[in-house]
Amino acid sequence: MVNTRKSSLRLLGSKSPGPGPGPGAGAEPGATGGSSHFISSRTRSSKTRAASCPAAKAGGSGGAGVTLDEARKVEVDGSLSDSHVSPPAKRTLKQPDSVCKDKSKSRSTGQREEWNLSTGQARLTSQPGATLPNGHSGLSLRSHPLRGEKKGDGDLSCINGDMEVRKSCRSRKNRFESVNQSLLFDQLVNSTAEAVLQEMDNINIRRNRRSGEVERLRMWTDTEFENMDMYSRVKRRRKSLRRNSYGIQNHHEVSTEGEEEESQEEDGDIEVEEAEGEENDRPYNLRQRKTVDRYQAPPIVPAHQKKRENTLFDIHRSPARRSHIRRKKHAIHSSDTTSSDEERFERRKSKSMARARNRCLPMNFRAEDLASGILRERVKVGASLADVDPMNIDKSVRFDSIGGLSHHIHALKEMVVFPLLYPEIFEKFKIQPPRGCLFYGPPGTGKTLVARALANECSQGDKKVAFFMRKGADCLSKWVGESERQLRLLFDQAYLMRPSIIFFDEIDGLAPVRSSRQDQIHSSIVSTLLALMDGLDNRGEIVVIGATNRLDSIDPALRRPGRFDREFLFNLPDQKARKHILQIHTRDWNPKLSDAFLGELAEKCVGYCGADIKALCTEAALIALRRRYPQIYASSHKLQLDVSSIVLSAQDFYHAMQNIVPASQRAVMSSGHALSPIIRPLLERSFNNILAVLQKVFPHAEISQSDKKEDIETLILEDSEDENALSIFETNCHSGSPKKQSSSAAIHKPYLHFTMSPYHQPTSYRPRLLLSGERGSGQTSHLAPALLHTLERFSVHRLDLPALYSVSAKTPEESCAQIFREARRTVPSIVYMPHIGDWWEAVSETVRATFLTLLQDIPSFSPIFLLSTSETMYSELPEEVKCIFRIQYEEVLYIQRPIEEDRRKFFQELILNQASMAPPRRKHAALCAMEVLPLALPSPPRQLSESEKSRMEDQEENTLRELRLFLRDVTKRLATDKRFNIFSKPVDIEEVSDYLEVIKEPMDLSTVITKIDKHNYLTAKDFLKDIDLICSNALEYNPDKDPGDKIIRHRACTLKDTAHAIIAAELDPEFNKLCEEIKEARIKRGLSVTSEQINPHSTGARKTETRVEEAFRHKQRNPMDVWHNSANKCAFRVRRKSRRRSQWGKGIIKKRKVNNLKKDEEDTKFADYENHTEDRKLLENGEFEVSTDCHEENGEETGDLSMTNDESSCDIMDLDQGQRLNNGAGTKENFASTEEESSNESLLVNSSSSLNPEQTSRKETFLKGNCLNGEASTDSFEGIPVLECQNGKLEVVSFCDSGDKCSSEQKILLEDQSKEKPETSTENHGDDLEKLEALECSNNEKLEPGSDVEVKDAELDKEGASKVKKYRKLILEQAKTTSLELVPEEPSEPVPPLIVDRERLKKLLDLLVDKSNNLAVDQLERLYSLLSQCIYRHRKDYDKSQLVEEMERTVHMFETFL
């Protein structure tokens, strides 16, 4: 688009008829430097002001194209400008001389100058007498001072002081520099509607006149206009429209507009500067529409009201409210420079880094640890980035809880503990302790366990070490550079809290091997980690520990001193380590396991890691539980168990080992295992020969077999010091060395000759051993694995055909080389090659050459033991194999067939002992019926220590303090609302005398605040109850008749809805739940709900006593009224009623009533006297009330029934055991149970006199012993049972909660079962069935009118029936299980005699030994299996004659097949 400003300016300048020096020259500065102030479309058509100088009026008449409307505006503006009023204090005046001078110059430009200004820029100063072509507003005759661009005339560049044209370029303090602006603002505010109407008229007039003005002003030539396409034409017109819409003088701007622009100026400064700098290139359509919409909704809301609404609770903001997302309010700066951007960025960066560092806090520190000592100045309390919560870490795991890893633990102490305890050692030698170590090994070997123990060890004592735990994926992020930033923050925080430890679990996922095929992100992370661990910056006292299962996957650059100084192999534990681990896991068992059993168990657990051994102990305990109490698997309720009767046996561990698959054997089976008990007598002699040869070939095996707690390092340290050792110090340093100086004769003796000394370590030259023999001699199946089991302390690398060809991604040569590399890295080690003859024939020549090359490359004295087996004779092996294993060096051991003595030991146990064993008899426990276990009582809560109680009370008090602050804010908000003034104070009784007669519980907001101060509210629910009470009182006292009453009712409902809405919107549900838990916990602990008692006049109901001490005091005072069968039962006491309930004993349910409010002490005493009299009358009628210090689990306190429906009563009415009724009705017992769901209705059921003494005693026994809920002060009597007898049948009705609370019928029946003798268990089972039939009896008859039995509610009847059905189903399940497993006792018959011909068995043994002379080991095993099957088939026979005959036939038949 072509800029036509200057061209049109020249045209206007040449046609200007008005006087004045240089109109054309004077218009150009005005076109580019005019003021840019504007007002919105709502006020653009308002009346303008005239010029303040007299010359302006004279110049206004000389304008060529001034319309009548504009002339009228000139007169109005002139009148406004005459009334000069001082502006606000912040709007300073400019010098009047320059103003007049500029106005005189602008006057000479006339209308042409005005049009040029309106089309030149977005926000321009309006010129005299012009009308904008867009029709939005008119221009005043008074010209604003111009910021002229000095291009030819110096006089035209005069500026009004330091007044700038552009809004973004001028000084903000000169923004409202006009005398008449405040007058215009006042006038526009008062005449908004008139301005809008005039605006619409001006739009229509100027829209019709726009095309004529364009032609008259010669904006474009005809050719140029016609050549433009429609798109360019429309766009050009829209830009002209947008420019002219802001071409209004600054002094016409509304002050509220300016203030609102100032509040948004920080967000819009950059856009305004760009838009005004580009002038014609950027439209303002969106901004125009937004401004128009803002001023169309009257009235204008003041800014301070909006601010007050958003910051209602900013003074005492607590976590009880949700955090609302608030709009950031930018500050208004007077500086127009951007020099503070860098400083602002640095401040934001520092705050962001501080917040991120605070999230990287150690996992072994708690809030109290960080708030104490020097750590208080280092960090602030925050959350850890690791997925390990400090509360979830087992604090009991210490170094003494780890078995078999003493070497690793000592190394960790050298790295972490010793630099703190003995810094003088490191200072003396000027050394730094190792700062990095790498844990690697199979899964479950204790890598993470050692890290946990280290974290707990670092948390002890005065010098605590910060422990940071990260997994490999914790630092990864999808954002570019975020992973590196997290690593840098982690090391930064660790450096601030030094000494510290960073543990990277599964570090292979964080720092894999870098390669060309790898993603660049991982390469960057690895590079960052390398630089952080050992870069230019000193890492300081930061120990880095990494753990991985795949050592080869870690980048090799990490595996060097300075980064990971040490590498610890966590191999599978050997027998000694396994025994230690078993001792650790079973040290708290009672009774403890014997040392001999643990040793044998450790020997059997070959290939088990630490996690497997722990799982073995757990599985064995569960099997013992399953064997002792199988009933618990058939019931979903907790049953009473005798834990002391659960005793583990060796059989439990055996079955557990059958169920567990070791982690190391899930993918690859272990190569070594001990000789089985069956095969040991047969191959024990051969195995001992192998061990003897092994000591010669591979002397390092002695270290593995020794039970002493020593290794090579300890052998060196315990060795006697060589007195003849040479000094390693300089000759002049006599005082520093205790050694004698070297003589001239011994100069050439090497200093480091310890490796050649046989006193320090065993020496072996290429240790190799080949077990050769006939096929089936047991060298591969039994002897070699047993030998590897003996050497299990060494790492074993299996080199067989599956190891070469199982991985398709590797070639056999590569797999072979990999195995040798691993063997050389973990010396001393073993390379195991089973079936070497078959292996040599199967592999290719390349693999053979690779194997021989790698074997020869092993150093001569390197302790790498090559163990091989061959199923062929040594003479039949290939020559290359014979060259590897030499007979003359005792590297070949020939396995011979078992001799006669070995075979006799092998078959002796089977023939003489197993075949002559009597048949097994059923155990006495199996013959008896399964024991029906009673339901268990809920266990009492754990007793807290004094410190825990105090800490918990402090936390609860802090939470309740936040709740009170929130409730005060809500109450203040309601009280200060004018609509709710009538509820802010109590009702004046003098004005409304009958108020207390209608309203029994008055409530107002001032009383609510008082209750808040007295700590009466533990939850927001209690607060809302009083708000609802205010509403209900207003609705009850003010009928819906008069208009005034209707207003009060409307405001009461509004008060209720407002309070509920505020609570629902601003109260955090988690915080509310926490308050509910606090209230429930305090009720369970026996504490009163409120810390201060409410005044007597505020309640009209009886007070509730909930103190446990008072309950026990009443228990001692009235021993006959206490049920004392269990230590966990509720404490009952006979108490005096506080209000009249005389008609309750007659079985009549009436609407609950409350006493009137008492205003003084005398009325209260009088009511107490009446209640006491009422109690005496009740006692005379055979009734009294038993009150319990029990509360329901829903958290409501037992108290006033008239307050809320959520409060329930635990009152129980019963007859004293020593009292009898005089009316001959027999024993009378009344029970009252009030529940939340029944709206405070009591249930009184009277048992008939037809109950026999046995049933009565059972019921009394239940009342004494089975009122249990797990705690002494928290029992709820919702489930009080009621026994009814209708038509001679017994019916049990109860109301039991669910879950842990058991029904009363269960307790009655199970208690009867526990009292009966065990020998009559079958008869008791029949009694239970009769009781179940009694339970099925329903009460179908109507009650007599004069009876004392209360009619039950329909809902309660259904609930009671459902509970009875539930219990009946439980009893039937146990009865069904019992009947299934019940074995009828067989009549006692004499045990038949055992017939065994032992002499015949001995002959069979001799025959068997003779016939198996030439049999191999595998053939002997097959014969043993056949004989074992014969014994199993005849295991129930008392006459073993047929067994012996079948065994003889088996021996002869086996010999025939051979």
Curated annotation (Swiss-Prot):
Biased composition (Low complexity): 34-58, 1240-1252
Biased composition (Gly residues): 23-33
Database matches in SUPFAM superfamilies: Bromodomain (SSF47370), P-loop containing nucleoside triphosphate hydrolases (SSF52540)
Record-listed Phosphoserine modification sites: 16, 79, 81, 86, 140, 318, 939, 1338, 1347
Region span, Disordered: 1-155, 244-286, 321-353, 1189-1208, 1217-1257, 1309-1330
GO MF, one annotated term: ATP hydrolysis activity
Major subcellular site: nucleus
Record bears the keyword Heme: no
Keywords on record: ATP-binding, Bromodomain, Coiled coil, Nucleotide-binding, Nucleus, Phosphoprotein
Gene3D superfamilies: 1.10.8.60, Bromodomain-like (1.20.920.10), P-loop containing nucleotide triphosphate hydrolases (3.40.50.300)
All copies of domain Bromo, residue ranges: 951-1066
Family assignment from sequence similarity: Belongs to the AAA ATPase family.
Designated name of the protein: ATPase family AAA domain-containing protein 2B
GO biological process, one term: nucleosome disassembly
Acidic residues composition bias: residue spans: 256-279
Domain of life: Eukaryota
Sequence ranges of Polar residues compositional bias: 116-129
